């Protein structure tokens, strides 16, 4: 068949794909990469809420802020305890010249300035132990302060190490290796009109218990007149004859049947680009190596859904008998060979009515001929 191969970075050359009244930029709840575009505003005590959930707050930080925060935390603890050591030495009289006071035992040896106190705090916290500066038995409160510093800084180091490991090992990074097709297409599959997307696992390690679902977000007005800005409707997807736990070892094609139960049943080639909705697609899976649950997300708006197109096959069989996934074709679509679903619903009804009338006349003619033959 004659096919038109094209990239989804430019719109298809079809008249029904564009219109003079279309919006070029539509607001979307979720970006193509799966990040939320919702801004949380005017929340009382939001910073206090973040501090109460400090673990999640620190993990969600960007790496540059996290490293800056932790470096500043260490420097501040060294300096803070250094100032306290300096104050203890000042009160005890350790900063006076040693010649002026005979038989004087300082609280901390070789700490006669703020710089020396800072270095003693740093050496104690990092357990460097050069041996020049050391604490004595002269001041019990200095000994207590040293113990408190080691306990507090140990807890800080445990927290820092835990957040670093949690950020590195979280399944979000695994979810980023799941690739969705940039566009969706509407075509026929097994005689049914379907909305189709492609999903691929970019790693060789498998994903267990994969479940793909969709949420249709659009404005809805209730019978009482209430206007719901983002009404959510469930959009079910299936692979071939299976709807649960697909084997995502190769790029897979997921289908949503546009039947009477579908929230997208009113779509036509003419009104597709005029609709106001967003289709959010979620893929939940378990990582094989860590058993952690990950979720990958994307969304599609009407401008990213192409009517009458189909995806170019990605998987092929090589000469040596191995399956090959060519990702250079992953974003390629072509015009569907089946043109029976290009017409609008009204045109389809007219054709069906015409066929019914012709069939009715044929049956009447056969009945008349049969009656005449019997006579």
Curated annotation (Swiss-Prot):
Effect listed in the UniProt record for changing residue 110 to N: Results in increased potassium current amplitudes
Reactions mediated catalytically: K(+)(in) = K(+)(out)
Any one GO BP annotation for this protein: regulation of monoatomic ion transmembrane transport
Transmembrane portions of the chain: 61-87, 140-165
Intramembrane stretch boundaries: 114-130
Site (Role in the control of polyamine-mediated channel gating and in the blocking by intracellular magnesium): 157
Gene3D superfamilies for this protein: 1.10.287.70, G protein-activated inward rectifier potassium channel 1
Keywords, alphabetical: Cell membrane, Ion channel, Ion transport, Membrane, Potassium, Potassium transport, Transmembrane, Transmembrane helix, Transport, Voltage-gated channel
Superkingdom as given in the UniProt entry: Eukaryota
Extracellular topological segments: 88-113, 131-139
SUPFAM superfamilies, per database record: E set domains, Voltage-gated potassium channels
Family listed: Belongs to the inward rectifier-type potassium channel (TC 1.A.2.1) family. KCNJ15 subfamily.
One term of GO molecular function: inward rectifier potassium channel activity
Regulation acting on activity, per entry: Channel activity is regulated by variations of cytosolic pH; reversibly inhibited by acidic pH values. Inhibited by Ba(2+) in a voltage-dependent manner. Inhibited by Cs(+) in a voltage-dependent manner.
Protein name in the entry: ATP-sensitive inward rectifier potassium channel 15
Keyword match Transmembrane helix: yes
Gene Ontology CC annotations of this record: monoatomic ion channel complex; plasma membrane
Source organism of the structure: Cavia porcellus (Guinea pig)
Compartment annotation: Membrane; Cell membrane
Membrane-related topology note: Multi-pass membrane protein
Quaternary structure (record): Can form heteromultimeric channels with Kir5.1/KCNJ16. Interacts with PATJ.
Parts of the chain on the Cytoplasmic side: 1-60, 166-375
Pfam families reported for this sequence: IRK (PF01007), IRK_C (PF17655)
Function of the molecule: Inward rectifier potassium channels are characterized by a greater tendency to allow potassium to flow into the cell rather than out of it. Their voltage dependence is regulated by the concentration of extracellular potassium; as external potassium is raised, the voltage range of the channel opening shifts to more positive voltages. The inward rectification is mainly due to the blockage of outward current by internal magnesium.
Annotated motif Selectivity filter, positions: 127-132
């Amino acid at each position: 068949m004659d096919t038109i191969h094209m990239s989804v970075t430019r719109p298809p050359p079809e008249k029904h794909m564009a219109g003079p009244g279309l919006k070029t930029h539509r607001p979307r709840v979720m970006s193509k990469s799966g990040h939320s575009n919702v801004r949380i505003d005017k929340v009382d005590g939001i910073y206090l809420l973040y501090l109460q959930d400090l673990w999640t707050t620190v993990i969600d930080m960007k790496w540059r802020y996290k490293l800056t925060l932790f470096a500043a935390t260490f420097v501040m603890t060294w300096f803070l305890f250094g100032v306290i050591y300096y104050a203890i030495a000042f009160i005890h009289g350790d900063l006076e010249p040693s010649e002026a006071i005979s038989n004087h035992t300082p609280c901390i040896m070789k700490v006669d300035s703020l710089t020396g106190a800072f270095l003693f705090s740093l050496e104690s916290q990092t357990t460097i132990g050069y041996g020049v500066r050391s604490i004595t038995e002269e001041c019990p409160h200095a000994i207590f302060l040293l113990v408190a510093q080691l306990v507090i800084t140990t807890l800080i180091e445990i927290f820092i190490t835990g957040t670093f490991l949690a950020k590195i090992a979280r399944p979000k990074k695994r979810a980023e290796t799941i690739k969705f097709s940039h566009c969706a297409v509407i075509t026929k599959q097994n005689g049914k009109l379907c909305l189709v997307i492609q999903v691929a696992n970019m790693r060789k390690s498998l994903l267990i218990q994969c479940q793909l679902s969709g949420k249709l977000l659009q404005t809805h007005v209730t019978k009482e007149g209430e206007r719901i800005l983002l009404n959510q409707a469930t959009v079910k997807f299936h692979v071939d004859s299976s709807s649960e736990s697909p084997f995502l070892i190769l790029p897979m094609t997921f289908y949503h049947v546009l039947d009477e139960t579908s929230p997208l049943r009113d779509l036509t080639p003419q009104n597709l680009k005029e609709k106001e909705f967003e289709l959010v697609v979620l893929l939940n899976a378990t990582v094989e190596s860590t058993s952690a649950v990950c979720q990958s997300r994307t969304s599609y708006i009407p401008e990213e859904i192409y009517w009458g197109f189909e995806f170019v096959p990605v998987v092929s069989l090589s000469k040596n008998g191995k399956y090959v996934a060519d990702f250079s074709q992953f974003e390629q679509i072509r015009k569907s060979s089946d043109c029976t679903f290009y017409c609008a619903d009204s045109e389809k009804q007219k054709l069906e009515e015409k066929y019914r009338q012709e069939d009715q006349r044929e049956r009447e003619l056969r009945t008349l001929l049969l009656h005449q033959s019997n006579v």
